[in-house]
């Protein structure tokens, strides 16, 4: 149990310190929105392994979250390709290239699907997402850190 709690603290820290773009004094919400979408699909049983496919359902959930949390955003447009690719700068997210090994900096959905099989999150993080209290803790961290507007 101690290791599980240690891991939850680690991922709460990582989630509250994401490397995000900034423009006009605002933090880009894309990475938090993507992580929230992943958590929703894990909870719904639509993602059942640490492999995060760039599925139509993930795209739809991301877009729904973008509209829900930031409906009037002016400086950022919800493009899941940006965070899906740039999440590789986070220590818990890896892009898995296709067999040709070509790994270009591509952020279009079609380009990502062409060059990458999937993204993979840490197994420890995936396990944490199955625990309701832990998942809520991580969701709260993302919302309060990046998406809560006064």
Write out the residue ranges for each language-model feature.
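Intrinsically disordered, charged low-complexity linkers and terminal tails
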Residues: 1-150
């Amino acid at each position: 149990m101690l290791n599980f709690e240690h891991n939850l603290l680690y991922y709460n820290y990582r989630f509250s310190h994401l490397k995000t773009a900034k423009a006009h004094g605002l933090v880009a919400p894309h990475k938090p929105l993507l992580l929230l979408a992943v958590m929703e699909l894990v909870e719904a049983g639509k993602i059942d392994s640490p492999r995060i496919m760039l599925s139509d359902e993930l795209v739809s959930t991301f877009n729904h979250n973008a509209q829900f949390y930031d409906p009037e955003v002016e400086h950022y447009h919800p493009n899941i390709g940006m965070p899906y690719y740039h999440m590789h700068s986070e220590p818990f997210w890896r892009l898995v290239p296709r067999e040709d090994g070509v790994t270009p900096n591509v952020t279009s959905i079609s380009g990502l699907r062409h060059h990458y099989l999937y993204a993979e999150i840490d197994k420890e993080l995936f396990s944490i997402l199955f625990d309701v209290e832990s998942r809520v803790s991580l969701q709260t961290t993302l919302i309060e850190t990046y998406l809560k507007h006064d």
